[in-house]
Every structure is written in C-alpha cells, then in structure tokens.
Amino acid sequence: MMHIIDRLTRPVLFAFDPERAHELSIAALKTGIPFCSGGVQNSKLAVSVAGLNFPNPIGMAAGYDKNAEIPDALLNLGFGFAECGTVTPKPQEGNPRPRIFRLTRDRAVINRLGFNNEGHAQALARLSLRKGKSGIVGVNIGANRDSSDRMADYEEGVRTFAAVASYLTINISSPNTTGLRGLQDRENLSELLQRVMRVRNEQAALIKRKVPVFLKIAPDLSEEALADIAQEVLEKGLDGLIVSNTTLSREGVSAPAASETGGLSGEPLFERSTIVLAKMRRLVGPALPIIGVGGVHSAETALEKMRAGADLVQLYTGMVFAGPGLPARIVSRLAAYAEANGLNSIAEIRDSNIKPWADRPLA
C-alpha cells in the first residue's frame, strides 16, 4: 500500500516547484491522515543515546518541519525521532525565491533557503502543546541573519526551548547565512559552546533536567578543523555531534542545476559525509553520541552510517525522492537485518567499518 502511495505522491508533488511541493506535503501531513502504519516495532532497534530512549535509530533531519508544525505526524511515518527547525529568535523570510532546486538525475537537492522560519514564539507555542506526549522531538536552533550578536541568539534558543525539546541542536554549519560557518573556527566555537552550555546548565536548575545539546557541523572541513571541533566538543561537555549539514561541493553531480548556489543534499553527499563521520568518531572516541546524516536513502545506507560510527541516523532528501513510506521501509528492513544476523541490538554494528571510511582523504 505504501509503495502505491509513494508512486502516486511523487508525480503530483513534482508537478510543482520544490518549495510549493514542500508546503503541500506539510499541509497534507497536518490533516492527520494516516499515510502509513508507522512501520514495525522491534526491541532490537531501540537505542539509548544521551539519556534518551529511541524506539529506532532513524530520524527526520532538520529543515523539513522548520516551524514545528508536524512533529507527531512525522513520528507516525515510522521515524524514531524528529528534529524541528532551524528556528531563529525573530521570524525571517530567508533568501529570495527560487531557492530550492531538484537535481532529479542525481537524486539530490540544492537549497539556499537562509533559515526562513516563523521565529521562536510560534515554534514554542506549538511545541508547548505537546506536553505529556510521547516521542522524541529535537529543536535545531540558529541565528538571525541581521543579528548583532549571533552567539546570543543561540543562548536565547537554548533558554527558549530547553523545557519543550527532547534535545537541542546548535546549527552553525548552514552555508546559506553569510558568515555563519565562521562560528566553527576554533576561537569562535570555544566561546559559543561555553556560552551555550552555561545557559543549558542554568536552565537545568529550573526545569530539573539537562536537555542534551548536539553540535551540527559541515562536511566541508579540513582534518585540522575536525580535530579542533572534536577537542572543543569534548572539553565543553556537549552531549553529541550531528555529521553533517549540506555541502558546497558539487562532486558527483551532473544535473544542469548544479551551478546554483547553496547547500547540496541527497545521494551525492553520502560519501563525503560518511568520511567526515568516521573521522569524527575516531577523534572523539567511542563514548560521545553521533548522529549521521547525509545521503541516506535506504536501509543499507543507514546501516553503513552506523558501521562508520553513528549511533543514530537522519534523512530528509531521500524521502523527497522515495516518498513518505521510506522511513517505515527502512525501519522494517533494519529489523529484518537484526533478526537475520542474530543481533541483540542494532547498536552492535556501530563502528564495525570505521577504518575504511576514516582512512580516506578529504579531497
């Protein structure tokens, strides 16, 4: 049934420009119509990460549900968790349209959205209505383009969402806000993480819970930069990493739209993001949680992220091309894999193929 829905929805949505198609898909999920059964429930897929118990390791990446409109609908598709955002303190329009481009031949997307969102207040109001509901919902926080103190924007994000988010993601790796990636430079990163974690700890005293904080990094980093980030993350006591955001590289892309500016996501990102993932796992050691994202479009690519060092895996662009049944299909196939290979937990495969990935050069 799900494959039929997928085959029907793609041509309908692809008849519209990408941003309008995205808006229509959000509207469809807001109706509450059960587009699928949510996939299998299997205890072998349960993963405990950063003090949170995930029913399965497959999550919806940030960027789809920017304004926290449909987190529960996403969980109902079979995702083990959903990440809303990126959300900035003040509403902002983002960059001029058109700003999303499908590269259908490459099963990829280029976006230069620029953190378009309705701001903290709207997202907070929606997430507050989830109080008492089950399901892991993270919030990805960013800085306004015109902010005079971007680090303060991240502090405000932590302060605003600590009580309503299962976890928080510090997004300093989008390529579509001028200067934002400069916060990954070691001196800036050190100050940012110190400030963010101070606010997190202040909020913990108020809400009686330390909300886990993850840092999302770019794939377009040097070996030296990765080492610096790893050291800062460990020193400042962050709860985990998300590897990685979209890339500025166009390697492996042949579609004419490849010349558009913006961040590339989808299948061509898989290789680079997985190399960076494995290198970061090697740098931070076995204890720090890592969420792997970039080019995941199947059970096998999800498994390979875990073999390369990921505790959890996120996807987004894969669902653009495969349809809303993708998460449930992946979860079902992960369960079958765990059963067929005699695993007690899918987590047992983590790190089983780090070396071939981590040894590859960052071209």
Curated annotation (Swiss-Prot):
Annotated substrate binding lies at: K66, N111, R112, L113, G114, F115, N171, N176, N245, T246
Which SUPFAM superfamilies does UniProt cross-reference here? FMN-linked oxidoreductases (SSF51395)
Q: What is the annotated localization of this protein?
A: Cell membrane
Q: Please, one GO biological process term? A: 'de novo' pyrimidine nucleobase biosynthetic process
Q: How does it sit in the membrane?
A: Peripheral membrane protein
Q: Does the keyword Flavoprotein apply?
A: yes
Is Metal-binding given among the entry's keywords? no
Tell me which residues this entry annotates as catalytic.
Answer: S174 (nucleophile)
The reaction(s) this protein catalyses: (S)-dihydroorotate + a quinone = orotate + a quinol
Question: What function is annotated for this protein?
Answer: Catalyzes the conversion of dihydroorotate to orotate with quinone as electron acceptor.
Its family remark reads: Belongs to the dihydroorotate dehydrogenase family. Type 2 subfamily.
Protein name according to UniProt:
Dihydroorotate dehydrogenase (quinone)
